[in-house]
Amino acid sequence: MTLRDLLADSPDNSLSGIKWHTLKQSIVKCLLSIGDATILELSTELQSSIPTISKAINELLADELIVDSGKISNSGGRRPSLYSVASDKTFFLGVEANRSGTSFGIQNLKEEFISIDLDSSFILENTYESLMEFCDRIDTFISDSQVDKSYIVGVCVNLSGRINSKEGFSYNYFFKENRPLVEIISEKIGLPVYLENDTRAMTFGEYAQGVVEGEQNIIFLNYSWGVGIGIITDGKLYYGKSGYSGEFGHSPLFDNEILCHCGKIGCLETEASGWALVEQFKQALQNGRTSAISIDNDTSAIEQYHKILSGVLVKEDNLCIELITRQSEMLGRALASLINILNPELLVIGGDFSRLGDFVLLPIQSSLKKYSLGLVNRDVAMKKSILGRRAGVMGACRVIKEKLLTPLT
């Protein structure tokens, strides 16, 4: 038996079989949550007798799903054993697909990467053929990682746009009203699959392993091709009713008659985003501005976008800096409204633009000071993401673990 088998439904459909299976699931979930525990601690936590817990522990040991981690050193008398989930047989796979490429990462229980690939150029398109290739690439990554597939307890796929994580639907990719996307992918790769919004996963990654240092109320800004936010309140990801929270880029802030990708006019993204930057750069050149950066109209908009960003870092091009400064000031003003409403402890700036450092951070900070309430502004610290492109796959792996810890009903 693998951990994935244990976390699935009981093979014994009798009442006693289901009850016993559920107890062993609860023990494993408890150990995943707290790290390690004695039989007495598990008995207290799960409100089950010591003999019953001992019997279940012995079965889990026999199945090599948990291990004896050693004795408690500071206990008087007979020292009890500590038990933990077998770390060499428990892995989480995070996958992030966006307009720039696809990233893969497998983490162990210690949240260490066993294998990671952030450089796949595969672009997921909204076609069935592309989805099947996407699934094949997941399988190839697992095979190349040399991690036994049976030890991967779950896969979390991050996609942009509106994601219903509870039901497994993406409303931007492969939306089939009667078939959740997670079912299609799971059927193809043979693993449990979860779906998450890319910005929310990045937020969780930063919270778990990034710049967050104990703060419990956080706004994460994903400033990339599009613009979104992730929100953590009291240490928990905020989803909203159906999981669509964080569509910050579609705030209707401008009377500019520019059509957004969402179908509305005047969204924040129409003035401050990667795709807006490309349009603004082209328009500036048409208006007679000069730049050290030249973009080939035969290349994709995504390639043009990354070239403009590189123009700031590599050549410190005046036009690129001017456009990004203007965008960042607009974002700062929009963020000031959020800060006034939510009163967070920490604002994390992430996404592609964050690698530009002070070229983005200083204009945002200036606008925050100018437009947010002084008392509220003094409460919030602003930091740049330290995880970069790893944030998404880190968060995806963490999402799987959190899903496994969902209380049994």
PLM features: residue spans?
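Short, ordered coil/turn segments that flank beta-strands lining enzyme active or ligand-binding pockets
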Residues: D88, L109-K110, K166, T233-D234, ...
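Glycine/GP-enriched mid-protein hinge/lid loop-to-helix segment characteristic of carbohydrate kinases
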Residues: L3-L7, D12, I116-L118, N126-S130, ...
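Glycine-rich phosphate-binding loop and adjoining helix at the ATP-binding site
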Residues: S120-N217, F359-K369
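Short glycine-rich anion-binding loops that position phosphate/pyrophosphate groups of nucleotides
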Residues: S160-I163, S224-G226, F353
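Short glycine-aspartate micro-motif
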Residues: F92-E96, I152-C156, I218-N222, G228-G230
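ATP-binding/phosphotransfer module of carbohydrate and carboxylate kinases, centering on a glycine-rich
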Residues: M1-S69, S75-R78, L82-L118, I123-D148, ...
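Hydrophobic "anchor" residues
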Residues: F113, I163, S170, L237-Y238
